[in-house]
Amino acid sequence: GEEIGGHVVSGHVHTTAEICAQEETENNREVRFRLRDREIVKYILPKGFVAVDGCSLTVGEVDEKEGTFNVWLIPETIRATAFRVKNVGGSVNIEIESSTRAIVDTIERYMERKEKEKTG
């Protein structure tokens, strides 16, 4: 079979985000999103995956305090998706990558258990 580009997207919408900034550069477009539910940011990791309006994208930078993250779109992604008509202030659907969510939740449960054992 052929290689899967990106990650498996299930179509679940975990939250929405607002496009808070866009900047065109010579070869791509940087888009910054502000999450509606900021606690979701713990699942969005630099160089990790996130689905934005069903499109699998690689995360650039994450600002946990502000609940924002950015992606870089190449011209082909802009051309082939709805990103060609998205503007600052617009809303998008966000799907968290399932294995990242499972890993973060597992580590949190483990750390909580260890803390309880310590304070026991």
Describe the residue ranges of each PLM region.
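Conserved loop->alpha-helix
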Residues: G1-G120
